[in-house]
Amino acid sequence: MPPTSVSPPRTAPGPANPSPAHPSRVRVIHPGGGKPGGPVVYWMLRDQRLADNWALLHAAGLAAASASPLAVAFALFPRPFLLSARRRQLGFLLRGLRRLAADAAARHLPFFLFTGGPAEIPALVRRLGASTLVADFSPLRPVREALDAVVGDLRREAPGVAVHQVDAHNVVPVWTASAKMEYSAKTFRGKVSKVMDEYLVEFPELPAVVPWDREQPEGVDWDALIARVCSEAENVPEIDWCEPGEEAAIEALLGSKDGFLTKRIKSYETDRNDPTKPRALSGLSPYLHFGHISAQRCALEAKKCRHLSPKSVDAFLEELVVRRELADNFCYYQPQYDSLSGAWEWARKTLMDHAADKREHIYTREQLENAKTHDPLWNASQLEMVHHGKMHGFMRMYWAKKILEWTSGPEEALSTAIYLNDKYEIDGRDPSGYVGCMWSICGLHDQGWKERPVFGKIRYMNYAGCKRKFDVDAYISYVKRLAGQSKKRNAEESPNPVVKLSKSQH
């Protein structure tokens, strides 16, 4: 892991460095050293796209330099990891992969899909006689454990195969941005800003590689696969206010009809924290989570239009780069990113000091999930997440803090917030989601505030404060309309085993 936050100078691809990616974006996990000329396999994990993908670019560069063919592989994670993914997330994932597979075929790029889990990757590598396996990066435990298992298998059974990991998700690679877990956005922002110009560069074209002449991928019956996987998953209805895939992601960013940067960026700075104005938000988080669009592409395009709305673009870049990549920093350096033990010591102490404080209201997880509390604003935020698949960012803070206030202790509060977030949010099971819950409940990336019952020194939020910031009644009415439309539509479509939520609320 690089010990400093400043990366080495950028070098152009060449015999000594055939990769188009910045050298510090790549980690050599296992050097290998055998099978020269064997295919290069890109194991796609988090970054499910062909365009603007540093991991794919790195793999293609290696293949081109050795006149070797290139293949892409994706393995669906088995249970228990997928137990926390419901029909909502799995449907989006698979429909995106279906589009990706078609795009890969159009480029004559073999795409291997496995349903038996990451354990199938080493077997593919051995069958193909691959020289190098390239994986993209995720800081989450299940993905890191899967990568460790694959590397361990290859070290035992095919030690000549090199294994590289490329951070294709962050503008500044997580291990380069900082060598430690950062305390706050301020400290992280300072480090990232120093090297931003070195990494925020335009993507090159994908290097040309020799035609594929090895084992062909098995055909996939996508309709059957989607139906089977979704039928086995918990029935949280899919959404359709955003379509999966790279083309839809670019349309959401730059579309002439309703693109964020082309049509809506101007109001971002002033309206993004108003839950009654959801169109002020980018709507890009599902695409960023599933890797259908590169954050670097979003940042590059935002910089191009900064002269039109500098304050809004700067605010967007703060969220897109600093805050989002700070979440990866936390999850990378703190393995207990979803536990009270992952909080700073001051936060753990103050929460435990007040864990036995009397609560005015105590709700069960079932009551919270069904939005059965005394607070109509909180109920609305929960219903927005259930029916829309995305809760407004400002409301997520209020929502999580009230869970701390209304459950028996901080551990229960955090586990409940993460459970509900991962179940209903289309971008659940994401570093930003874990950090959002940790910020609200455990004071992560925040400071201590005036001590009070239950919260201790954790920042407090209440109904009156929300009422001063936005039209609470308008938000509640908006969500009621959403929920009513969704329930009606689901009732009409209930014979269909794969139910979707409408785009009418977007």
Swiss-Prot record:
FAD binds at residues 268, 282-285, 319-327, 390, 421, 427-429. Binds 1 FAD per subunit. PANTHER family: DEOXYRIBODIPYRIMIDINE PHOTO-LYASE (PTHR10211:SF0), DEOXYRIBODIPYRIMIDINE PHOTOLYASE (PTHR10211). This is Deoxyribodipyrimidine photo-lyase. It is an enzyme of class 4 (lyase). Residues 1-33, 487-506 are annotated as: Disordered. InterPro entries: Crypto/Photolyase_FAD-like_sf (IPR036134), Crypto/Photolyase_N_sf (IPR036155), DNA_photolyase_2 (IPR008148), DNA_photolyase_2_CS (IPR032673), DNA_photolyase_N (IPR006050), Photolyase_Class-2 (IPR052219), Rossmann-like_a/b/a_fold (IPR014729). Expressed in proliferating tissues. Highly expressed in roots and shoot apical meristem (SAM). Expressed in leaves, flag leaves, and panicle.
